[in-house]
């Protein structure tokens, strides 16, 4: 098969003293996200999508939150590792579509910087990377500003040999 599709989803609640990092970009906000790593919920969802497309499990399998080696880990390093696994299997990113679900903070001012960061980490043309944000109209935990959820879908294409 020459193409594979992967879907990733992740959620983190607000809290703690870490800065809010989304898609590799520090986003000004009152608080960060609670997590074993740096809490970059965007990169976690993308990593899961890549691993899913390659039938390699999920980030919990590769970077368990019970392993002290990953305490405070830079999620960009984790993402690049997951992408390298795909490259090792002969696949490259075809395109990526990310949806950030959050009532706050407003994401529009940060979308382009996130796309640029993802383009660099995934060694891909920025035109193959889409990031968008939505709210839940004040419904549910994201609507109550308790946390952020992210969905990511990747299309991975066999790289020419």
UniProtKB/Swiss-Prot annotation:
EC number: 4.6.1.12
GO terms of molecular function: 2-C-methyl-D-erythritol 2,4-cyclodiphosphate synthase activity; metal ion binding
Domain of life: Bacteria
Pathway: Isoprenoid biosynthesis; isopentenyl diphosphate biosynthesis via DXP pathway; isopentenyl diphosphate from 1-deoxy-D-xylulose 5-phosphate: step 4/6
Cofactor note: Binds 1 divalent metal cation per subunit.
GO annotation terms (biological process): isopentenyl diphosphate biosynthetic process, methylerythritol 4-phosphate pathway; terpenoid biosynthetic process
Biological source species: Shewanella loihica (strain ATCC BAA-1088 / PV-4)
Cofactors: a divalent metal cation
Binding site for a divalent metal cation: 10, 12, 44
Site (Transition state stabilizer): 36, 135
InterPro entries for the chain: MECDP_synthase, MECDP_synthase_CS, MECDP_synthase_sf
Listed name of the protein: 2-C-methyl-D-erythritol 2,4-cyclodiphosphate synthase
Bilayer-crossing regions: none
């Amino acid at each position: 098969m020459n193409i594979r599709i992967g879907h990733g989803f992740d959620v983190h609640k607000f809290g703690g003293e870490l800065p809010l990092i989304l898609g590799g970009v520090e986003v000004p906000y009152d608080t960060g996200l609670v997590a074993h790593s740096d809490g970059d919920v965007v990169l976690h969802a993308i990593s899961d999508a890549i691993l899913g497309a390659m039938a390699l499990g999920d980030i919990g399998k590769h970077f368990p939150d019970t392993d002290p080696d990953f305490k405070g880990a830079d999620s960009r390093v984790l993402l690049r590792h997951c992408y390298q696994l795909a490259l090792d299997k002969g696949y490259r990113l075809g395109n990526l579509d990310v949806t950030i679900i959050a009532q706050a903070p407003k994401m529009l001012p940060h979308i382009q910087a996130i796309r640029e960061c993802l383009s660099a980490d995934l060694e891909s043309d920025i035109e193959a990377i889409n990031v968008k944000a939505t709210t839940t109209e004040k419904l549910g935990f994201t609507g109550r500003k308790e946390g952020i959820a992210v969905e990511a879908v990747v299309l991975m294409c066999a790289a020419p040999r």
